[in-house]
């Protein structure tokens, strides 16, 4: 009789151990990132911002991969975001110059023209050796030393705006130079540059992925308003992203305020193709 009681007690003890381990497993999973991808250029971790640091950092930790403006964060904050497994990509605008940057006065003479719909930006001459050197050896080094996991480079669309050979070669030189930091590179937009790179068999030697905005949505900058993309543009982008995928590039989408029905369509499209996407609330990317 005592032997049976002992066996029953051991059985319940084992059940309790299993239950405890399962509970611990669920708790651990709950703390790991739950969402795939987010672009948060409007979020800062600095003390002078209105939202408490911890609240912002916790929001970013909920993602497996985030794109941030590095100057909005300290290296310590980037380490904290990464602590639970989040990958942090640093934004770097290589094809345009913003008037709020501390180096604006140094390079404004090398700008080419105002950037439509973005009053604070100007297209840059990427063939300029001083601009190339600054991006590669100053900003590139600074951002990589902060502990980012990759670069998110904006405005290679300069090659669409100015389709000269020196612009194309200038972009290639910048990308080649940034490779010295051994970090993956994602290009935001730049489909004209990307497609030529693919055709010449150079894409994977220069960058690792592409992010395309507004495949399924579009922005009316006059309001602003967030709308569904027209069929022709959507078809063009889908064909372009298919080429990028076939070339071995990773593919990301950033959409703006897609409603629940459209979000389901985008989610299905991305699952079928192995893409990641982010549904931004607004242009502020917060």
Please annotate each region the language model reported.
Residues 1-2, 26:
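Short, low-complexity interaction segments enriched in Ser/Thr/Pro/Gly
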Residues 2-13:
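Bacterial N-terminal signal peptides that target proteins for export
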Residues 8, 22-24, 31:
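Intrinsically disordered, low-complexity segments enriched in Ser/Pro/Gly/Ala and basic residues
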Residues 10, 24-26, 145:
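Compositionally biased regions
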Residues 12-23:
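Bacterial N-terminal signal peptides
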Residues 28-286:
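Glycan-processing catalytic domains of CAZymes
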């Amino acid at each position: 009789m005592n032997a049976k009681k002992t066996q029953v007690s051991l059985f319940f003890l084992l059940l309790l151990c299993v239950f405890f381990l399962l509970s611990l497993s669920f708790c651990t999973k709950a703390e790991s990132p739950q969402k795939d991808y987010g672009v948060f250029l409007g979020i800062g971790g600095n003390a002078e911002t209105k939202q408490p640091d911890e609240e912002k950092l916790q929001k970013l930790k909920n993602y497996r991969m985030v794109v941030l403006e590095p100057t909005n964060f300290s290296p310590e904050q980037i380490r904290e975001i990464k602590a639970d497994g989040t990958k942090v990509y640093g934004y770097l605008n290589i094809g345009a110059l913003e008037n709020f940057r501390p180096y604006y006065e140094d390079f404004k003479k090398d700008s080419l023209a105002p950037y439509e719909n973005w009053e604070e930006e100007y297209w840059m001459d990427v063939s300029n050796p001083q601009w190339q050197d600054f991006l590669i050896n100053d900003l590139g080094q600074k951002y990589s030393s902060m502990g980012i996991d990759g670069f998110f480079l904006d405005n290679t669309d300069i090659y669409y705006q100015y389709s000269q050979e020196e612009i194309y070669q200038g972009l290639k030189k910048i990308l080649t130079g940034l490779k010295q930091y051994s970090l993956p590179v994602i290009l935001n937009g730049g489909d004209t540059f990307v497609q030529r790179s693919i055709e010449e068999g150079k894409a994977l030697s220069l960058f690792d992925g592409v992010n395309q905005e507004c495949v399924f949505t579009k922005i009316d900058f006059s309001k602003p308003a967030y709308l569904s993309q027209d069929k022709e543009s959507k078809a063009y982008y889908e064909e372009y992203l298919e080429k990028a995928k076939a070339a071995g590039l990773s593919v990301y989408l950033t959409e703006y305020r897609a409603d629940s029905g459209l979000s389901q369509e985008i989610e299905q499209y991305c699952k079928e193709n192995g893409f990641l996407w982010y549904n931004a609330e607004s242009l502020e990317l917060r």
